[in-house]
């Protein structure tokens, strides 16, 4: 009986107005819905990247690789933003692991070298570095030059044999990288930073202690074209956590450190990675980095 108060034209106008209001209301939510979709996708990616439930072990500590185990990936465009060097700039990208370049005994000698150097300083947080090239040594919340700060003690801390082994190992790592990626090793140059690292479970005191963040070496350092890690201690024996994690789009892929193990990879976005937080014990390693640009090359260290 109430509908008879309105004529048909009036009802049509009211219906159209109501429909327009509803359409406007839904359209106003579209940007919010799109934002929520993007945020959900980003959070899902982050969860998958950081969750151990979606992790594949590339190489376990218990395996012994007498030949490099190679995993090829498509090269990123990062290298296009830098000058190209034929025979060196990555055209074949990937990651590889081998246990046949450095012996366990040599790794133990290098670990003792690092222990002696780091005993003179050390970070207040969980991550300390020693760079034999620049002399940089973590001390408290800052860095000092070990060669200047401890000039009277250097001969008691390092020996020429230590440095000779360090140079020899660097050469062997450079050779296996060149062979694996089909490079001219004479066109590869050691670059900075190249350093020893010591990581334990102590909480971070400065940003320098926050080693666990995902990053891309080519983006972070610019000069890097190939990155290598020489592990000096054993995962699950000397420390817990601290695995090296390649963060691929569909899964995490980890390398479990083993004393004497060398892991190496092209340094671009194709190898986004992080290191798990060390939860107990102490993890020692050497980062040995290479560039194709001679202007960014550094010399082997020499004992002062």
Give, region by region, the residue ranges found by the protein language model.
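Fe(II)/2-oxoglutarate oxygenase catalytic core
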Residues: 2-262, 269-304
């Amino acid at each position: 009986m109430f509908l008879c108060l309105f004529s048909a034209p009036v009802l049509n106008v009211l219906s159209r107005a109501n429909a327009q209001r509803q359409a406007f209301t839904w359209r106003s939510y579209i940007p919010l819905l799109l934002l929520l979709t993007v945020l959900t996708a980003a959070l899902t990616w982050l969860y998958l990247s950081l969750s151990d439930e979606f992790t594949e072990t590339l190489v376990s500590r218990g395996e012994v690789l007498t030949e490099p185990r190679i995993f090829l990936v498509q090269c990123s465009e990062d290298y296009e933003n830098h000058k190209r060097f034929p025979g060196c700039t990555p055209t074949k990208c990937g990651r590889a692991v081998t246990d046949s370049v450095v012996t366990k005994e040599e790794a133990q000698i290098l670990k003792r070298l690092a222990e002696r150097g780091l005993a003179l300083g050390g970070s207040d947080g969980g991550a300390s570095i020693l760079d034999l090239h620049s002399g940089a040594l973590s001390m408290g919340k800052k860095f000092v030059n070990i060669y200047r700060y401890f000039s009277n003690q250097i001969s008691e801390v390092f020996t020429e044999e230590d440095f000779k082994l360090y140079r020899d190992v660097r050469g062997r790592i450079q050779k296996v990288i060149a062979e694996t990626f089909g490079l001219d090793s004479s066109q590869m140059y050691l670059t900075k930073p190249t350093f020893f690292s010591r990581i334990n479970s102590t909480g971070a005191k400065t940003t320098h202690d926050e080693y666990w963040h995902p990053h891309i070496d080519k983006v972070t350092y610019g000069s890097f074209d190939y990155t290598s890690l020489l592990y000096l201690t054993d995962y699950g024996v000397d420390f817990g956590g601290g695995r090296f994690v390649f963060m691929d789009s569909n899964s995490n892929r980890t390398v479990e450190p083993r004393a004497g193990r060398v892991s190496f990879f092209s340094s671009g976005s194709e190898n986004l990675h992080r290191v798990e937080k060390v939860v107990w014990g102490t993890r020692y390693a050497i980062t040995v980095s290479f560039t194709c640009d001679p202007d960014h090359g550094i010399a082997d260290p020499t004992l002062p």
